[in-house]
Amino acid sequence: MHILNLGAGGFIGSHLTQRLLSEGHSVTAVDLWQEKVEDLLANPRLKFIRQDIREPGWNLDRLVQQADLVIDLIAYANPGLYIRIPLEVFRLNFTENLKIAEACVRHGKRLIQFSTCEVYGRSAASIETANLVDPEDPIHATFSEDRSEFILGPVCKHRWIYASAKQLLERVLHAYGLEHGFRYTIIRPFNFIGPKIDFLLSEREGIPRVFSFFMDALINGGQMKLVDGGTQRRCYTYIDDAIECTYRIVENPRGVCERQIFNIGSPYNEVSIRQMAEMMREIYAEKFAAPGAVLPDIVSVSGDEFYGKGYEDSDRRIPDITKARTLLGWEPKWNFRGLLEATMRYYVMEHRRAQKVEALQ
């Protein structure tokens, strides 16, 4: 197939592009950044286009028309941005992505749309005040694609604009399927992690995602900051597991993925953010730190202090992956410690390589 991969230069997009090429597909990759696919650019089946999709007049229709399949990964997916530039987050995640979907409708092309597990919002236990729900029972935080309610916070907590934009896009895709027979599949990722996930804070300005923030503190010094105590729980999924499931959706055996939504995540890897920080310190001390090295302190800060006013978070979310198991025969393989160590090793090796290059200059 010839596949148009929009957002191919990001974390998920770069790994997916590599897999698509390894399976023999040709790929037109569109992104603002090419650093994460630099090692793939020599492949004759890859065409990389540096493009900001917000610019007027770019050749979206022609690229969609030439493709057999369109994959859309383009998004602002960083809580710091939801707080600082909520309008731009909405415009990119809904308005610009809707243009891509409508181009697919016009030209009769199948679309794989990456959404987010954040559409589920908060768990039922987090808003129940009569003590009728056991907050420790995972059933109250396990989310199903076609049955679970969406529980988002108040409008003044504009952190939820990202989830709202993604949810609205999902609903429009569903409507196009109903009224126009549009062929789409929606993916809701649950906290993918792996090499190339993010930048380290010492390398550039901004607020990276939590793993990269902790990793930077371990490598370069500083505190491992837990937002609101790090009590939030997440189910982490190694990128290799995630890409395997995504590729099965690309293959679409017997058409089982048509107009379906899939959770991709590992329900077995639930940890609190505090537990993650503690395990990263433990692994770093055991595997990577110099003898006698001083490890960073783990400290708690408020969400308002770390991100700014308007921050709120989901307390807990666990994916129900029954659909992926049943329709795709997929099961995640990586446990939490294994995926954490593998990802940390990548960043440590990259840091050491950069140090050697710098020493030679």
Regions found by a protein language model. Name each.
Residues 218-361:
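C-terminal substrate-binding subdomain of Rossmann-fold SDR/epimerase-dehydratase oxidoreductases
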Residues 161, 165-168:
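Active-site helix of classical SDR
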Residues 53-92, 103:
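NAD(P)H-binding glycine-rich loop region in Rossmannoid oxidoreductase-like domains
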Residues 25-34:
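Conserved glycine-rich Rossmann-like NAD(P)H-binding loop of the short-chain dehydrogenase/reductase
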Residues 3-23:
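N-terminal Rossmann NAD(P)H-binding glycine-rich loop of SDR-like oxidoreductase domains
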